[in-house]
Each structure stands twice: as C-alpha cells, then as structure tokens.
Amino acid sequence: MLRVAVPNKGSLSQTATHILEEAGYRMRRDSKDLTSWDEQNDVEFFFLRPKDIAIYVAKGHLDLGITGRDLAADSAANGVDELLALGFGASTFRYAAPENEEWNLNKIEGKRIATSYPHLVSADLAKRGIQADVIRLDGAVEISIRLGVADIIADVVSTGRTLRQQGLSPFGDVICTSEAIIVGRHNQPVTDEHQILLRRIEGILHAKNYLMIDYNCPKSLLAEATKLTPGLSAPTVSPLADDDWVAVRAMAPRKDANQLMDRLSALGAEAILATDIRIARLTR
C-alpha cells in the first residue's frame, strides 16, 4: 500500500486534492478527516500540515508527499528528492525591508532577520558568508519590524500585496523559487506504485497544458501545416473523401491555441477545431 501526504490546509491544499481526484483517487469527504483510504487504488492519504510533510517523507514514515519546494527545503534539507513539479502555488522567497529604507545584501551583516523558514534563511546566509541573527516566527512575520523584533524579514512572496500593506519591499536576489511539488525520500527507489501515481498526475498536468487541434488541409499545404502542428511525435494524417484533402490531428500547447488557429486559417486550412484533453499519458 502506498502512503501519501497531502496538505491539510493553506494555498496548496485545495488544488492538490482536486488534482488527485481528477487522477482517479478517492479523497476524504470531511475536511476534519486526517486520513483517507482509497481501497480501489490501494493508497492511503494523510492530511498533514504542509510544513511537516517533507519531514515524514524524509524519515520514511510516508512514501510520497505534496508540499511546497520552499517548505521541503526548510524542513527536510537533503532528506527528500523532488520527483514532480505540479505547476501551481508559485511564489518566491525573498528578503524584505521597509520600503522607505535603502537595503542590499551587504547590509544584512549583524542584523535581525525574522522568518518562518529559519533553515532556508540560515543556509542562504551561510552560502553568502553573512553572519546575522535569525529569529524564528510561526506567522505574521511582516509585522515583526514594526514591533521592533527584527530589522528585516525573509518570507514567501506571491503577489507582494501583504508586503505592500505593511510598507515593506523585497530586495536582493531571490532565495528560492517555489511551487507545489511531489517529494520522495532521498535516494529511495521509485517503485511501480510510485510510478503509477506520478504518471497519473503527470497526465492531468499535460491535459491542462495541451489541447487537441483538428483541421482539414489541402495535400499541397500539408508539409507547411504540419510544421505548425508537429504534435508530440508526429501528427495524425487521415484521408478524406476528396483525394486532394486530408484531416490532421495533433496535440498543441494550450497557450498557443488561438495564434496557431489563426496561422492555420491563413495558410488555407478549414474546419479548425480545438478540444480539451481530460487525461493524458505521454511517452516523453
């Protein structure tokens, strides 16, 4: 049986649960449930604090976990390996200071830095050869400067709205670029059970990023048309009742769909359709 950790709350929780449901897994029915067993797929899900997930996986108590890259780096150091990036929950981890003050990384030396990610900050300071006092807080880090607890902060930045509300501005290099990821124990062999779950979720991600393009095309323009729609390996080309025309089908990036349809139309293709892909299994 596979044992998988899922965030029980926070920005990653709802999307992670939704992706697993789309991948065919039975999730908890009550938000208060701490575990859920999917008998059909022989997977038990554990709903845990996002910050604790990498710790459980690193120690071998759970096989896989969904968490943030920043959380994994802070809580488990080198104890877990990133197996799959999930493409949601994007953020950066930055130093920030009052926006009316001039700050750079050279000014951090000897200062007080408030953060909920002490290991991540300490590792960054050590890499830069900077000595500073790292103060661990469990939340509301942005208010610590106003309260006199810290000189600067290091925190997750998504939109920057919370920082601006507190009169703060990020500075210096990005410490960590984060998103939701699936982690496994460091150097743990990836078993067939692992692969099934990873491929299912990967299929959901591909379905969100791609769609299927269908169109009719004169044979004389086929070479040019298929340059626009090469597909994954090659497009599917089928004969039509009119021997001078063929039907073409190919996967294409969702973000390029409208421009691609415009170019196919200008080339001379007809009956151009774009349809969603619900789930996919790709070899590459």
Swiss-Prot record:
Tell me, in one coarse class, where this protein mainly resides. cytoplasm
Q: Which reaction does it catalyse?
A: 1-(5-phospho-beta-D-ribosyl)-ATP + diphosphate = 5-phospho-alpha-D-ribose 1-diphosphate + ATP
Per the record, what is one GO cellular component?
cytoplasm
Q: Which domain of life is it from?
A: Bacteria
Q: Which GO BP terms apply?
A: L-histidine biosynthetic process
Recorded metabolic or biological pathway in which this protein acts: Amino-acid biosynthesis; L-histidine biosynthesis; L-histidine from 5-phospho-alpha-D-ribose 1-diphosphate: step 1/9
* Regulation acting on activity, per entry: Feedback inhibited by histidine.
Keywords noted in UniProt:
Amino-acid biosynthesis, ATP-binding, Cytoplasm, Glycosyltransferase, Histidine biosynthesis, Magnesium, Metal-binding, Nucleotide-binding, Transferase
Name the cofactor(s).
Mg(2+)
One annotated GO molecular function is:
ATP phosphoribosyltransferase activity
Enumerate the subcellular locations listed in this protein's record, separating them with semicolons.
Answer: Cytoplasm
Would the keyword Metal-binding turn up in this protein's UniProt record?
A: yes
The record's section on Gene3D superfamilies has: 3.30.70.120, Periplasmic binding protein-like II
Enzyme Commission number: 2.4.2.17
Provide the function of this protein: Catalyzes the condensation of ATP and 5-phosphoribose 1-diphosphate to form N'-(5'-phosphoribosyl)-ATP (PR-ATP). Has a crucial role in the pathway because the rate of histidine biosynthesis seems to be controlled primarily by regulation of HisG enzymatic activity.
Q: Which family does it belong to?
A: Belongs to the ATP phosphoribosyltransferase family. Long subfamily.
Q: What is this protein called?
A: ATP phosphoribosyltransferase
Traced from the root, the source organism's taxonomic lineage reads: Bacteria, Bacillati, Actinomycetota, Actinomycetes, Mycobacteriales
